[in-house]
């Protein structure tokens, strides 16, 4: 959804877990990639890629935009370190929670609009905005790929239904891992690893006539062959974006939105801490900034203190 490759999220999680846990005194917050920055990161990839590689093929332009966004992310990390050093943690006292909640809600709508097409196995219209994507969903449902839709539907049912079951200790089971295990098993059962065509008969498709659908590796997440080609797991930042207004715009957004959301998440988790420990928000901001510098240098996504994972951390008994 952000325009970054999947391996970028892994780098962010690894760097956040190692660096921030040593530098920050926020005991319970989980640092990593978050939905709150998806729209900004995706915008940076698209706009910077278009500005510096308008004549390139789509794949090359997207990769260039990715590298340019890494340069912006690294510079934003440096600014976050400086903000923390100059007592920028006081930003938590200046911004009310309501606009942040509104921003997060809008981001949720955008993610739903984009990923609903993926869940049912239909290609989303390129360049369409969230409202256009939502308006096109009814038509997309009539063209859905049944096997992919079954995997998506079962995964959502487990994700939202499993925690509601009245079974002792069920909430301590990481439901995301259950979803992942079930989805992998279903993907193997449907033989998604190999390109093939299957028939599906239903009143929903073509007036009850059996319809043919294609499935194959394109429905699987593409991961780089790290062991065969270690260099493919990394990407170097491109700093040319810092010399244009588009790049400076996203530098401001990366720094301010990332810092505010991270600080507010840390503040919320401080209130939930069963031991009532106090967090140094300046120190936490410096830790996030330092981790963002390293993450961007490796090819990772920008990170923040993530409220959902941090709350799950507390619910799982973290101290």
Where in the sequence are the language-model features?
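Transmembrane helical cores of multi-pass ion-transport proteins
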Residues: 1-319
């Amino acid at each position: 959804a952000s325009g970054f490759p999947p391996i970028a999220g892994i780098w962010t999680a690894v760097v956040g877990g190692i660096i921030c846990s040593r530098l920050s005194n926020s005991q319970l917050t989980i640092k990593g990639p978050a939905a709150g920055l998806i729209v900004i990161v995706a915008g940076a990839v698209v706009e910077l890629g278009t500005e510096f590689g308008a004549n390139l093929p789509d794949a090359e332009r997207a990769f260039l935009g990715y590298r340019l966004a890494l340069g912006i992310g690294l510079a934003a990390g440096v600014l976050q370190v400086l903000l923390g050093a100059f007592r920028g943690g006081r930003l938590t006292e200046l911004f009310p929670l309501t606009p942040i909640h509104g921003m997060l809600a809008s981001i949720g709508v955008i993610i739903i609009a984009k990923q609903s097409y993926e869940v049912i196995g239909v290609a989303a219209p390129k360049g369409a905005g969230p409202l256009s994507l939502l308006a096109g969903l009814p038509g997309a449902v009539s063209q859905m790929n049944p096997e992919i839709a079954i995997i998506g539907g079962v995964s959502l049912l487990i994700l939202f239904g499993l925690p509601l079951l009245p079974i002792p200790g069920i909430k301590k089971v990481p439901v995301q891992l259950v979803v992942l295990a079930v989805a992998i098993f279903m993907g193997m059962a449907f033989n998604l690893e190999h390109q093939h065509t299957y028939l599906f008969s239903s009143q929903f498709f073509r007036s009850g006539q059996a319809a043919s659908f294609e499935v194959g590796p394109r429905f699987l997440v593409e991961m780089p062959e790290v062991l065969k080609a270690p260099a493919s797991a990394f990407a170097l930042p491109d700093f040319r974006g810092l010399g244009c207004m588009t790049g400076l715009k996203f530098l401001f957004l990366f720094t301010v939105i990332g810092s505010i959301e991270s600080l507010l998440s840390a503040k919320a988790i401080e209130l939930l801490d069963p031991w009532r420990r106090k967090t140094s928000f300046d120190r936490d901001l410096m830790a996030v900034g330092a981790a963002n510098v390293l993450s961007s240098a490796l090819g990772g996504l920008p990170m923040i203190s993530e409220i959902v994972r941090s709350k799950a951390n507390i619910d799982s008994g973290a101290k």
